[in-house]
């Protein structure tokens, strides 16, 4: 199973599929059936099957899987720090740091 993500074609669908593949790999490593994972997380088995085949799942259900596989800390770090690619973006980030609302 290939786990590469082409950084030049950053498509949400690719990320969703990669997360689904990774989740399935973690499930199989633990020896869980979809039914067992469903019982442990409260995520319906058909939802898990759809996620593993299409990459589509609600964020709430995805978070339940993340917690079950003990990736809470890693997930909580996503979007925790600003990212920028240009000096202009960095200036905007610093200027807007104290803002509470978008425009």
Model-identified regions with their sequence ranges:
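Short, basic-rich loop-to-helix N-cap that marks the start of a DNA-contacting helix
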Residues: 54-68
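Short, charged recognition helix plus adjacent turn
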Residues: 76-103
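Amphipathic alpha-helical protein-protein interaction surfaces
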Residues: 53, 71-74
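Short alpha-helical DNA-recognition segment
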Residues: 31-49
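Short basic helix-loop element that most often maps to the first helix and adjoining turn
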Residues: 21-36, 95-102
């Amino acid at each position: 199973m290939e786990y590469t993500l082409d950084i030049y074609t950053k498509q949400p669908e690719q990320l969703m599929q990669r997360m689904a593949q990774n989740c399935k790999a973690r499930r199989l490593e633990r020896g869980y059936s979809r039914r067992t994972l469903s019982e442990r997380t409260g995520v319906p088995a058909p939802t898990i099957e759809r996620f593993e085949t299409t990459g589509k799942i609600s964020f709430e259900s995805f978070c339940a899987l993340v917690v079950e596989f003990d990736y809470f800390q890693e997930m909580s770090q996503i979007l925790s720090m600003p990212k920028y690619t240009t000096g202009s973006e960095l200036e905007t980030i610093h200027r807007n740091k104290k803002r509470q609302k978008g425009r």
